[in-house]
């Protein structure tokens, strides 16, 4: 039962389904469920180790960079997100509801604060120190995705903590090694360019 609850939380946060961005070819990713594991291992023949592996990002989870950036925005907003859209500019006209509807997963808001603090500390004194940018507080997390028989993928996800400078960023560099390397360096340059342009 706990596994299905966890899976439902992920679905509410935009994983396992298309987010609905206005770009062709969007992937839905994949979040396994009990039915999937019963098919792979046999009815109720999979163990808690399978659930633990999935919970820490190992195993069969597939997420798109856009879904990860959306998760970052959800953490920055402390529990809600907009469906991502591609826009050139937003003017003073009233936007249709599809652009302004907030999606709020049924997750205790206190958890977001704890995660945000962990991401802040990763930048202050952890693997993301390179993401620091002047007096603008940045929160982030590096990741290293293992690839069988090849070099790991390098990940970084982060966001600006300032409400007047909203930015969520994600970078995956395939077969580039640790997350604190290429992905963090590229993300840092993107964030600096955006934040300089906005201040």
Regions found by a protein language model. Give the residues of each.
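Short, gly/Ser/Thr-rich active-site loops of penicillin-recognizing serine hydrolases
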Residues: 96-97, 101, 184-199
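Beta-lactam-recognizing serine transpeptidase/beta-lactamase-like catalytic domain environment
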Residues: 1-175, 179
């Amino acid at each position: 039962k706990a596994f299905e609850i966890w899976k439902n939380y992920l679905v509410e946060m935009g994983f396992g389904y298309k987010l609905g961005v206005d770009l062709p070819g969007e992937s839905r990713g994949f979040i396994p469920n009990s039915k999937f594991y019963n098919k792979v291992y046999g009815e109720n023949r999979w163990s808690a180790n399978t659930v633990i592996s999935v919970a820490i990002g190992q195993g069969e989870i597939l997420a798109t960079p856009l879904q990860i950036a959306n998760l970052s925005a959800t953490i920055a907003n402390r529990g809600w997100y907009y469906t991502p859209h591609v826009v050139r500019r937003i003017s003073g006209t009233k936007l249709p509801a599809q652009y302004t509807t907030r999606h709020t997963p049924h997750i205790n808001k206190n958890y977001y604060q704890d995660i945000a603090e962990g991401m802040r500390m990763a930048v202050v004194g952890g693997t993301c120190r390179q993401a620091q940018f002047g007096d603008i507080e940045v929160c982030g997390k590096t990741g290293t995705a293992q690839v069988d028989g090849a070099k790991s993928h390098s990940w970084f996800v982060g966001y600006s903590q300032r409400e007047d400078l909203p930015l969520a960023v994600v970078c995956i560099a395939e077969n580039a090694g640790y997350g604190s390397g290429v992905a963090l360096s590229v993300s840092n340059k993107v964030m600096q360019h955006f934040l300089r342009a906005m201040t």
